[in-house]
Amino acid sequence: MNVQGVEFLACLSSAQRIAAALAVIALGLAGLPEPAAAASGRISIESGGVARTALLIEHRRLKKARRPVVIVLRGGKDRAARLRRVFGFEDMARSSGPVLIYPDPIGGHWSDIAGAEASRDATFIRDLIAKLVSDGVADRHRIFIIGVSSGGPTVLRLACDDANLFTGVAAVVTGMPADLAATCKPSRPLPFLMIAGTADPVVPYKGGKSNWPEGKTDLVSVDAAMAIFVKAAGCGDGRTTTAFPDRDPHDGSRAYLDRWNGCKAPVELVRVEGGGHTIPGHVSAPSVDSARGPRNADIDSAKIIWDFFRRLGD
């Protein structure tokens, strides 16, 4: 501001000076670029002789270049639009630039048991990644995948059978089928993060029959699933446990971060003591919470997952 402007403000009342200053700030902000938007579209490919589709979300104003890709396999009843609201990953598409992919399952659900359907779904994800890489969208060395609820078993199968495809894997309120646990041997140390509630009525923390709408599946315990990735990562003895701040003392749960020591790749568990079959940090309808158990409000699942992935991709 010039000298005349200063003299002018000096003659004004306090209220007038504040109003004038706000006007100047507004003029300055008017010249700034608008927040970047995320563009969405659909991908169609043929996989195994079947037409398959996925929703793609990308940063509209970023230059076209190979970028990190985050693939999210949702639970059976969750549509892509709903999961986008649940996770909040779209905000990261604006600020950090990953391409977000929400593949569509056939018949509304992913296969959670071994067999032709499980093989078909895994092949679809492989074919989808190949297309993203060949089209110059994906950075082959920064491909991440997340499995939520009944979308988790497909992700875990891929982690067991195709560890080299992914830079990092996250599994959220899901479980590992017993048949998979018996044969799972990741080919390399694989960065792995799991978020699980100890009071989950759908996916028992200590193992047992799942209660997914698609059917009941024998699952191993969370500890048994983690042990597979701990072994693959060559971790040492013991783990370090850190409590997250208890931001909501009335939510009936506490969240802890377990980090295994001496690993060649990070292996971490966000253990929600008293948590149900809900994504921590997501606000859902009370009727949903009552059916799925307590919802933890102390942590932001999307931020935890993205921070984990970002450490791997830098």
What is each stretch, according to the model?
Residues 194-196:
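Short beta-strand/loop motif that positions the catalytic acidic residue
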Residues 32-69, 95, 99, 115-120, ...:
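A domain-start/cap signature at the N-terminus of enzymes
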Residues 41-144, 153-157, 161, 206, ...:
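Serine-hydrolase catalytic machinery in alpha/beta-hydrolase-like enzymes
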Residues 175-192, 208-209:
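Flexible "cap/lid" loop of the alpha/beta hydrolase fold
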Residues 24-31:
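Hydrophobic core
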Residues 198-267, 275, 281-299:
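Active-site-adjacent alpha-helix of alpha/beta-hydrolase-fold enzymes
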Residues 3-22:
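Bacterial N-terminal signal peptides that target proteins for export
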